[in-house]
Structure formats: C-alpha cells, structure tokens
Amino acid sequence: MERAAKKEAVESLNGLFQTTSVAVVAHYSGLTVAQMQKLRSQMKQAGASVKVSKNRLAKIALEGTDVVAIGSLLKGPTVIATSSDPVAAPKVAVEFAKANEKFVILGGSMGKTVLNVDGVKALASLPSLDELRGKLVGLLVAPATKIAQLTTAPAAKVARVVQAYASKSEAA
C-alpha cells in the first residue's frame, strides 16, 4: 500500500470512528467469503457496517475518537463492526458468532466505555431503539384509550337503561 493510499484509508476510518457510537471487534480467521458477505449484508440491514483493515492503520485512525479504547483489541485478523445505534452492531455480531464458531468476538466500545465479550453480549440483549420507541408510544397511547373508554362507558350504560325501559314499556 502506498503512503497516499494509507493516509486516505486512515482518514476514511477516522471519519467512520468519529460518527459511530459503538464498535465491536472480532476475529474472523477461517470464515469463507460467502460467510463474510452474509455478515456484511446482515450488518447493512441492521444499519451497521463492517470494516477489515490493517490493524496498524486502524489504531492510527482511532486516535482522537471516542472508541479509541478498542485499539488494544486489534491483534491478528480482526474485523470492526460499527453503528450509530448502540444495539445494532452488537446484536448482529453476537447472532453471527452463535451461527459461526470461527467468528470470535473480542470486545468492543460504547462511546468511551470499553466492553469485554460479556459487555457486548449484554448490549446485544437490549431492545433496539425502534423497539423502545414502539413500547414508549404504546405506553403513551394506553392511558388515552383508557380515558376514552371510561368517558364513553357511562353514556353506553345510560343508553342500555333507556333501551331496556323502552322495551319494557312496549311489552306492557
């Protein structure tokens, strides 16, 4: 790799690390091309990305970013999964690691917090941002529907009483 290409790669990686909120580092030695493509497509569907780069260049690119702590994990054939959603990359990485034993999660970083393997798995078990938003909307809408039911219930009861009284007087 030429010096200019290395500089461009470092700048590209640094831009990626500046905008990410979570990074997961894993070994990928022994995975086939098809498995790597599957990992990339799963990450893309989840809104995350996967990068394979020289560890030395990645360490340089990490300087000055929030996820600088993952530099110590960059040894051997590593892949870095990043996402702006704190749950997307860890969730896909953990699911992929369960299906492919050659994909070994080393750890990661969420902001300036370093995560070990258990931390990445714990982060992956959390609901996604969209799921949390859905639950929040459900909680906000539930009281409104209850109020609507309570306000219409007395009117419905009065209508049934009047209907029963009317049918009783017709029968008499």
Swiss-Prot record:
Keywords: Ribonucleoprotein, Ribosomal protein, RNA-binding, rRNA-binding. GO terms for biological process: translation. CDD domains: Ribosomal_L10. Transmembrane segments: none annotated. One of its GO terms (molecular function) is large ribosomal subunit rRNA binding. PROSITE patterns: RIBOSOMAL_L10. SUPFAM superfamilies: Ribosomal protein L10-like. It comes from the Bacteria. NCBIfam families: PRK00099.1-1 (NF000955). Belongs to the universal ribosomal protein uL10 family. This is Large ribosomal subunit protein uL10. The lineage of its organism: Bacteria, Pseudomonadati, Pseudomonadota, Alphaproteobacteria, Hyphomicrobiales.
